[in-house]
Amino acid sequence: MNSKTGPSVGDATLRRRIKPWEFVAFFNPQELRKETCLLYEIKWGNQNIWRHSNQNTSQHAEINFMEKFTAERHFNSSVRCSITWFLSWSPCWECSKAIRKFLDHYPNVTLAIFISRLYWHMDQQHRQGLKELVHSGVTIQIMSYSEYHYCWRNFVDYPQGEEDYWPKYPYLWIMLYVLELHCIILGLPPCLKISGSHSNQLALFSLDLQDCHYQKIPYNVLVATGLVQPFVTWR
């Protein structure tokens, strides 16, 4: 291994790590890449965590994972299994349906999903699919800076001295996706509009909020996106 590479030679996950440029390109919330990257962790009971990654090929990355998982793993219904996904795009409605079917078949498995972007979030089928996933017990959250840092440390073959990676884009971009995910889960109309530039495939964000958004979206989310001013208590 090159001496300038960060993870140690004895790191068992080294061969399964992705390149730094891949991580930055796949998980930038403003870059509208067509491909999907899935970083995942699997933990059986008190055993060590298994980490790996895959991408969409002839089918979506989520389907690839579930097919590979069921083909290679021996299931013991008495042992709890926790799975964590870090996805560059949120699941489409068909993948959401397949995930619910997968979890129904394996009740000892729990799933948490962290996403960097919402996939065609204006489409009602995709919105309903995510909403039903949450209602079925799946944790879905937008990746924060801490998740980006965690993925960098555990999934990326980072250069020596650069183990403390933090994204260079504004936190507001993340909070805009957080805002829209709340709309989806609460069954509210879309408030975030995303358009892409054909020249560089970067997303352009705009907001269109209604009274229902101000009434039902958590106050701290509205403050974080600058939509309302925080309360000030005078003494």
Swiss-Prot record:
Note on cofactor: Binds 1 Zn(2+) ion per subunit.
Reaction(s) catalysed by this chain's protein: a cytidine in mRNA + H2O + H(+) = a uridine in mRNA + NH4(+); cytidine(6666) in apoB mRNA + H2O + H(+) = uridine(6666) in apoB mRNA + NH4(+)
Keyword terms of this UniProt record: Cytoplasm, Hydrolase, Metal-binding, mRNA processing, Nucleus, Zinc
The protein's required cofactors: Zn(2+)
Active site: 62
One GO CC term on file: nucleus
One Pfam family recorded for the sequence: APOBEC4_like
Binding site for Zn(2+): 60, 92, 95
EC number(s) recorded for this UniProt protein: 3.5.4.-, 3.5.4.36
Record family assignment: Belongs to the cytidine and deoxycytidylate deaminase family.
Function according to Swiss-Prot or TrEMBL: Cytidine deaminase catalyzing the cytidine to uridine postranscriptional editing of a variety of mRNAs. Form complexes with cofactors that confer differential editing activity and selectivity. Responsible for the postranscriptional editing of a CAA codon for Gln to a UAA codon for stop in the apolipoprotein B mRNA. Also involved in CGA (Arg) to UGA (Stop) editing in the NF1 mRNA. May also play a role in the epigenetic regulation of gene expression by participating in DNA demethylation.
Summary of subunit composition and partner proteins: Homodimer. Interacts with A1CF; form an mRNA editing complex. Interacts with RBM47; form an mRNA editing complex. Found in a complex with CELF2/CUGBP2 and A1CF. Interacts with HNRPAB. Interacts with SYNCRIP.
Protein's recorded name: C->U-editing enzyme APOBEC-1
Gene designation per UniProt: APOBEC1
